Amino acid sequence: SISLRIASEPLLSQSYKMAGDVEKAKQILQAGIYQITIELLNLLLPYMELCEKDDGLFEEICRRTLAITKIFHLETLHPSVLLTVYFSIAHNFYRRGNKEKTLDMLEKYTELALSGIYPLRLHGDSFFTLLDDWLEENLPLGNQLPKEEAVIRKNITEALTDTGLFA
């Protein structure tokens, strides 16, 4: 059984606000929103796979997942997560026999992988204006990803060429 999750960020943020540190209060909320957005996507992808036999639900999960990535500008905010989303959706469309949508997602994956997303680093944007400092202060690797960039690029390529998932 899973316990009900209650985010601690609103309470912590309120404490900082009451102490007069509004910037810290904002930073805590931004970090929480960022983390929950990534966590939500990490929940939606396996749920999508489990619901692949229900056409309507499967399509709705895909639609909502892609909407979240667009709303939060993951193409620039966290492209490595967006690559995972595109790949997962493509694979699920492939398993369902939908060649057109498979190719559409693989095209998006390839375009993003070949775009100017490198070097891949965790960072904020115009919405997450206080995230950069939070990442540096709270993550052991700061804004660095846990893998070397050469390994990441190789994995991105191998996802299409060596996995056999689309064979």
Residue ranges of model-derived segments:
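Short coil loop/turn residues that delineate tetratricopeptide repeat
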Residues: 2-4, 31, 38-39, 71-74, ...
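Structural signature of tandem alpha-helical TPR/SEL1-like repeats
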Residues: 22-24
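Alpha-helical protein-protein interaction modules
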Residues: 43-45, 54-166
